Amino acid sequence: MKLKDYFKKQYEKGLWSMETITLIYMLFTTILIGIHRQGLADPQGMVLTRVLMLALMGVMYGAYRLYPCRALRIARVIPLLLGLIFWYPETYDFCSQYPYLDHVFAEIDQTLFGCQPALLFNKVLSSTFWSEAFNMGYYAYYYMMGATILFYLFGRYNQADKAGFVFLASFFLFYIIYEFLPVAGPQYYFKAVGVEAACTGDFPAVGYYFQNHTEMLTPEIKGIFSKLVIGAQEVGERPTAAFPSSHVGMSTVTMMLAWKTRNRWLFWVMFPVYLLLCCATVYILAHYLIDSICGFFTAILFFCFTSWLYDKLHPGYNTERD
């Protein structure tokens, strides 16, 4: 498709399914804000975030109505994807209203594997090469997802509505789990109880500890990618979203979407990065091994469910290439 064709007037009625599912998620979490408002640090700010997002979506839709073209319709997707950056930290605000369950998941790892894989993995592969390789994979998370969604928008436009729905709906399903299942992950839990205690198999319950404590273990910086990952965690990470791993889960959903494009270059270029990313979730202490394993299988379940749901809601959907 030529560049000028993206600006040719052509009105497509209705919302993106991504817009609809975002509005539903915003409504759902607004109800949660109302329920937990007494325990939340800044419920007014959370509501304001939703008002601003709604206003931005309205402005983007209004611009499209004034000059309907494919370029502006694609542009409407941008705030939906950027919204994930704001919705993620809120899972901590919600889940910290409940006692944390890290002792349960650390015990599961100990029972299944006879050790704490998160503590041993980076000791077994401690060289700068492996540290940088795994951190590179972890840091590529958002770039992989962004590349896949952009490929659909510009290379498989007629399939983009379904792909975007599957992607965002799966993300929101993970977020909903996190809002009710408080698990901080080993980088926070082992900092709280002590690495020595974890190595000896002592996993005390910490209750509401993470309501007021967000300190985490900081691994040694061995190169540019480990520095980038640590910097990103310092800015946006919270004691939340450990089980099941959305890094494994959503990268798996992304790989399945990439496969569905039938563009093998897209899939196979990302595949080794995907493997490094999955390993990195345990290597950098972000997840217990059971988190990552369950993240993989949860992704398959969510992908199948959201695909089925989309087909039910859009029985006449056109899946031809464009």
Whereabouts are the PLM-identified features?
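Membrane-interface helix-boundary motifs at transmembrane edges
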Residues: Q10-Y11, G39-P43, A63-A75, Y152-K162, ...
